[in-house]
A protein has these predicted regions:
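FabD-like malonyl-/acyl-CoA
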Residues: 2-134, 179, 260-290
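Alpha/beta catalytic cores of group-transfer enzymes, especially the acyltransferase/condensing modules
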Residues: 11-12, 35-39, 95-241
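Short, solvent-exposed amphipathic alpha-helical segments in soluble enzyme
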Residues: 23-24, 142, 173-174, 276-280, ...
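Short glycine-rich catalytic loops that host catalytic nucleophiles or stabilize transition states
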Residues: 183-186, 254, 286-287
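Short, flexible loop segments at boundaries between secondary-structure elements
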Residues: 222, 282-302
């Protein structure tokens, strides 16, 4: 049996209109989430609405779970799930550890807390072509910035005030970086600057039932599989304030014998970053590959 890995991306991959082309699976998720939060998600799917973190995060959860349900209905079952940042909530729903209704409410709160903590003047920046040691040298020399995501051997993300990121960009280029570019996130995610909102989110989790996952849930913060519901709550609540390593998570998935990585919408960034890790398997972006074709490609691999 092919071992399939469902991966849910984080912010930075979104584009307005993502919820306007949903099929019946996506529309039922949209309706369930809209009812849960008392807002029509379709009205939050525009360039203007996407300037607010919570609207982007809700759209990503909706698109991801819609696709997940479509693939499962077509007979593609995951052996492992993981999500980067907001994607972790999609992974927890896919693992049957968190209900979609609870996830929708928590994600709305999470986005509002993140946006409220840093309404403006903060962000994230991807640096290409420098290793982790060099990136950490740069963050140590510039105030208030942190290494927040280790995406691959050659891509590191920094978080902090925009003024400090500008200084870091110049230093990175001086050290030989191929690029230093801002990503579409308006808050300093995955660093200690978000510890206060994370604690508030943790309190909200106390009113929610989180079960033992039915599908192994891989943390992109620790690179380990989590079964214990208490540890899962900790992972979901605090992931906004902790460094992520997609590099380590992809490696951990490979070591668990994963043959096929399927990235949920939107985009295919995590899959392309993990291409070298899964060189002898299949990496598929479900945004651009119809379910029938995914089944066919998995069949050819067997």
């Amino acid at each position: 049996v092919m071992r399939v890995f469902f991966v849910f991306p984080g912010q930075g991959t979104q584009r307005p209109g993502i919820l306007h082309g949903l099929n019946t699976f996506g529309l039922s998720v949209l309706e369930e989430m809209s009812n849960a939060i008392g807002l029509d998600l379709l009205t939050l799917d525009s360039a203007e609405a996407f300037e607010r973190t919570e609207n982007v995060q809700l759209a990503l959860l909706c698109a991801g779970i819609g696709k997940c349900r479509e693939l499962e209905a077509a007979g593609i079952q995951p052996s492992l799930v993981a999500g980067l940042s907001i994607g972790a909530f999609g992974a927890a729903v896919a693992a049957h550890a968190l209900s979609l209704t609870d996830a929708a409410r928590l994600v709305l709160l999470r986005g509002r807390l993140m946006q409220g903590a840093y309404p403006s003047g903060y962000g994230m920046m991807a640096i290409g072509g420098l290793n982790l040691n060099t990136a950490e040298d740069i963050t140590n020399a510039v105030d208030d910035i942190y290494v927040s995501n280790i995406n691959s051997e050659q891509q590191i993300v920094l978080s902090g005030p925009l003024s400090s990121l500008d200084i870091a960009a110049k230093r990175a280029k001086d050290r030989g970086a191929l690029y230093a570019k801002r990503i579409q996130v308006t808050v300093p995610s995955h660093c200690p600057l978000l510890m206060c909102p994370a604690k508030v989110l943790m309190e909200a989790f106390q009113k929610v039932e989180v079960k033992r996952p039915k599908v192994p849930y891989l943390s992109v913060n620790s690179g380990r599989v989590i079964w214990d519901p208490t540890k899962l709550v900790d992972d979901l609540a605090f992931n906004m304030a902790r460094r992520t390593s997609w590099l380590d998570a992809a490696q951990a998935a490979k070591e668990r014998g994963i043959d096929v990585l399927i990235e949920m919408p939107p985009g295919g960034i995590l899959g392309s970053l993990a291409q070298t890790t899964f060189a002898d398997g299949l990496v598929i972006s479900s945004s651009t590959t119809p379910a029938e074709e995914i089944i066919e490609r998995i069949g050819r691999l067997q």
